[in-house]
Amino acid sequence: MSMFRTLQRQPRTISLFTHDLENSRPCLSILEYLKSHTTNRFDLELSTKFPTLDQVHYMNAINPMILRAQIPHLTKIMKLKSYDPLFGSQLSDCVTKGFWNKEAPLWVDWEKKALGTDLQSIKELLEKD
């Protein structure tokens, strides 16, 4: 897929999951960095909704430690059915219910199979490119 994407010169997608886009300093710093350092290399997808079950499984395969810190009840959540109301629900509600860590956003580079929760981790990823 990445060879095909390269041939088409399409940007790859980085998703940023956050419960509070406007007031989250870590989220805003990641956004500012991506806007100023990546030009047209990426499509940035901002999400204030809980990831799908498939996305949770994919992210868990990438880095279970980071994901477990972001989603406190990860083991329980991964056993839910894909149609459970949690998936796709507002992250602000998930914070209230204890299903999402309010301290940091979560970014995911789907193509490079990388994820993190802070500015430093995304800087390190982009420096490798």
UniProtKB/Swiss-Prot annotation:
Role, per record: Putative mitochondrial redox protein which could be involved in the reduction of small toxic molecules.
- Is Mitochondrion among the key words of this record? yes
Q: Which family does it belong to?
A: Belongs to the FMP46 family.
Q: Which UniProt keywords apply?
A: Mitochondrion, Oxidoreductase, Transit peptide
Q: Which residue positions are annotated as catalytic?
A: C94
Pfam families in UniProt: DUF1687
From what organism does this protein derive?
Candida glabrata (strain ATCC 2001 / BCRC 20586 / JCM 3761 / NBRC 0622 / NRRL Y-65 / CBS 138) (Yeast)
Name of this protein: Putative redox protein FMP46, mitochondrial
Q: Look up the transit peptide and give its residue range.
A: 1-21
Q: Which GO terms describe its biological process?
A: negative regulation of transport
Against InterPro entries, the record matches this protein to: Fmp46 (IPR012882), Thioredoxin-like_sf (IPR036249)
* PANTHER family listed in its UniProt record: REDOX PROTEIN FMP46, MITOCHONDRIAL-RELATED (PTHR28071:SF1)
Q: Where is the signal peptide?
A: none
Q: Could you name the domain of life of the organism this protein comes from?
A: Eukaryota
UniProt EC number: 1.-.-.-
Keyword DNA-binding attached: no
One GO cellular component term = mitochondrion
User: Which Gene Ontology molecular-function terms are recorded?
Assistant: oxidoreductase activity
Per the record, the coiled-coil ranges are none
UniProt subcellular location: Mitochondrion
